[in-house]
């Protein structure tokens, strides 16, 4: 049984006849966003590494409230894993993630491959104060990877 919030979102989706889209390339993502912005729509972004949970769901709902268009990135970012951290063991369930995003009214999931996000292995964003504090003390490349991917996502989606 749906709660009232889920019913409201479902009704909203039906009224707008939304079909959530999935893109895997930077080019197709930029093209969609450009078209939405030409129509005068506001675009919000919820960056994730997938394997979504209620915390992500609350961010998607908030983004839905504040924007005409909701883009969710679902990208396991290899640059924020150190050599002793197991990137391959990071949980992934794209089918589950996409079903959740669609149920929450997301308009687009951007699901790129690492080669599309990191075609230039020499360009990074690094904030030294982050790398030296918090978990940066024990995971020295973590924040460089996070800052880089978030910068790239902001550049690709250009959220309002």
Cite the ranges covered by each PLM segment.
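Nucleotidyltransferase catalytic core that binds NTPs
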Residues: 21-160
């Amino acid at each position: 049984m749906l709660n009232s919030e889920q019913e409201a979102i479902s009704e909203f989706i039906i009224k707008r006849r939304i079909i959530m889209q999935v893109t895997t390339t930077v080019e197709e993502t930029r093209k969609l966003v450009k078209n939405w912005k030409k129509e005068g729509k506001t675009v919000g972004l919820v960056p994730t590494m997938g394997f979504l949970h209620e915390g992500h769901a609350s961010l998607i709902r908030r983004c839905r409230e504040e924007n005409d268009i909701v883009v969710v990135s679902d990208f396991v970012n290899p640059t924020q894993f150190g050599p002793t951290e197991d990137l391959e063991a990071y949980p992934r369930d794209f089918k589950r993630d996409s079903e959740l995003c669609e149920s929450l009214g997301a308009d687009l999931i951007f699901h790129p491959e690492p080669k599309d996000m990191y075609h230039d292995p020499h360009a990074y964003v690094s904030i030294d104060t982050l790398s030296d504090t918090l978990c940066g003390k024990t995971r020295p490349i973590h924040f460089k990877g996070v800052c880089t991917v978030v910068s790239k996502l902001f550049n690709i989606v250009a959220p309002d």
